[in-house]
Design a protein with these regions (language model features):
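AAA+ P-loop NTPase catalytic core and its hallmark functional loops
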Residues: 1, 7-8, 12-203, 207
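Conserved AAA+ ATPase small/helical "lid" subdomain
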Residues: 188, 194-250
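Short glycine/serine/threonine-biased micro-segments
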Residues: 4, 80, 103, 217, ...
């Protein structure tokens, strides 16, 4: 059991593939090859990992849990592996999310991994080669990853600079799956499925997204993601006038 109960149907129906990414990810999982998801914000990277956790669990008839960590500039290696905490009886060690995933098996997903501090890279390197081990210096312990463990990371290449980028020594430990904005036809289906609006409105929103993305070559710094188009559709579905829905969900979200 994944603990999804009420949302299991939602997870099952929530991802529409754009290429062979499901087959590639499943193969990587079977062969214990770490996966790097790269692409712009709002192109479905997180949704894809959620779906694959469900998909692989269904195929294997056993739970393959997903442990997601939203990386940020203050995230340290200790946040991932664990730390000592003080309680009434003294100090005790509490495993971090990465350690729990390594021990019990499952997918550990580090979202926007380049945002984390550099010491986190040192931690994940031994987990992403033939060793598949996690070393916890504070405990003096070395853990071999469970057979069902897989490391998955994501990042947005468009946001990176010389100070925040994935080193080649890190990149080449992963197979990479690229996520791009879907075709207008597919995006129409996604918007319709996710927001519940009819095909005509979904098509108009997909067309709007495509036109806005063409403006990124003319000074617009951020493209309209599929996510914000879905948000606009949800507002329209709930009775907000279409132009206003697009203004608050799309225009004001990507411009200042």
């Amino acid at each position: 059991s994944l603990g999804l109960v009420g949302s299991e149907m939602c997870i099952r129906d929530s991802y529409i593939p754009t290429s062979d990414e499901i087959k590639v990810f499943e193969s990587a999982y079977n062969q214990k090859v770490p996966v790097l998801l790269k692409g712009p914000t709002g192109t479905g990277k997180t949704r894809f990992v959620e779906y694959m956790s469900w998909y692989i669990s269904e195929k294997r008839k056993k739970s393959v849990p997903l442990v997601t960590v939203a990386c940020h500039e203050d995230l340290t290696a200790s946040d991932l592996v664990g730390r000592y905490l003080i309680d009434a009886s003294g100090t005790k060690w509490i495993d971090g999310p990465l350690t729990r995933a390594v021990k019990s098996g499952g997918i550990c997903y580090l979202d926007e991994v380049v945002e984390a501090r550099k010491d986190t890279t040192v931690i994940i390197h031994p987990l992403t080669d033939h060793r598949r081990i996690l070393t916890i210096d504070k405990l003096g312990e070395v853990y071999e990853a469970d057979d069902d463990f897989l490391m998955v990371v994501s990042y947005n290449p468009g946001y990176q600079n010389a100070l925040k980028d994935l080193k080649q020594s890190t990149r080449q430990r992963f197979v990479a799956i690229e996520f791009e904005f879907p075709s207008p036809e597919l995006e129409t289906k996604i918007i319709q499925s996710e927001s519940g609006v009819d095909e005509k409105i979904s098509d108009s929103l997909a067309s709007l997204g495509e036109k806005i993305r063409n403006l990124t070559d003319h000074g617009l710094t951020e493209a309209a993601s599929t996510r914000v188009l879905i948000y606009a559709g949800k507002l329209i579905k709930d009775g907000i006038e279409p132009r206003r829905a697009c203004q608050v969900a799309v225009t004001w979200g990507i411009t200042d």
